[in-house]
Swiss-Prot record:
The active site is at H119. This is NAD-dependent protein deacylase. SUPFAM superfamilies: DHS-like NAD/FAD-binding domain. Pfam families: SIR2. Belongs to the sirtuin family. Class III subfamily. It comes from Methylococcus capsulatus (strain ATCC 33009 / NCIMB 11132 / Bath). NAD(+) binds at residues 22-42, 101-104, 195-197, 221-223, 239. It is an enzyme of class 2 (transferase).
């Protein structure tokens, strides 16, 4: 894959790069996306019901079991070349802000520090009533391949069931994370949008905000998305292939 001189110059000259990642990045590590069909124990359930406050209120064991199954899948997965290239890019620019819609920890395991998590984390549950954080036991849960119902633990402070630390459908994004993401979008010289459909709002407005400011948007995606018209560069391909090649080209282009 070849990259234009203009793109490489924009990367070299950027004082602040923002990287916005979606489910497509984690999918290359074998993590199912939210739109993938459910399998095993979950095949007769709707993900939009499981990922909702109403679903948890109706059947906490069903919802907690689904998220423990998902967390198990994540902990058994490994970061892919896109995760590592994004982490390495931080050492090649004055400032890099990583914003992710993903709820796994693959960015951190690849070496990225302090990503802004718009949709929360599978690894940081909290009390469903008083919101006290709950510390998960170390290691990988002993969950069957197909999944199962699991009663959620109880909060040590108030006794209410612990809930997954993610943003469910209908819930607001964490205000601090959203404010930090918007600030990065308003300040950066260049934003990568990688592996995201650009359909999930309000997060999807971040690249469009960058484009409206006249800053550069670079989209990395194997398929067309709603962002195509806003992006200055559309790099077609899997992030795990495109990002390492782009990082190599950037380093070769430096004097």
């Amino acid at each position: 894959m070849e990259f234009s001189d203009e793109l490489l110059a924009s990367l070299r000259d950027a004082r602040h790069i923002a990287v916005f990642t979606g489910a497509g990045v984690s999918a290359e590590s074998g993590i199912p996306t939210f739109r993938d069909a459910l399998t095993g124990f979950w095949e007769n359930y709707d993900a939009s019901t499981l990922a909702s406050p109403e679903g948890f209120a109706a059947d906490p064991a069903l919802v907690w079991g689904w998220y423990e199954w998902r967390r198990t899948r994540v902990l058994r997965a490994e970061p892919n070349p896109a995760h590592y290239a994004i982490a390495a890019l931080a050492a090649d620019c004055p400032r890099l802000t990583l914003i992710t819609q993903n709820v796994d920890d693959l960015h951190e395991r690849a070496g990225s520090a302090d990503p802004i998590r718009l949709h929360g984390s599978l690894h940081h549950p909290r009390c469903s009533a008083c919101e006290a954080p709950y510390r998960l036991p170390p290691g990988i849960p002993d969950e069957p391949e197909g999944g199962r119902r699991v009663d959620p633990p109880r909060c040590a402070r108030c006794g209410a069931p612990v809930r997954p630390g993610v943003v469910w459908l209908g819930e607001n994004l964490p205000q601090a994370a959203w404010d930090a993401a918007r600030q990065a979008a308003e300040d950066c010289d260049l934003m990568f949008s990688i592996g995201t459909s650009a359909l999930v709002w309000p997060a999807a407005q971040l690249p469009a905000l960058v484009a409206r400011r006249g800053a550069t948007v670079v989209q990395v995606n194997p398929a067309e998305t709603a962002l195509d018209g806003h992006a200055g560069y559309n790099l077609r391909g899997a992030a795990g292939k495109v990002m390492p090649l782009l990082l190599q080209a950037l380093r070769r282009s430096r004097p």
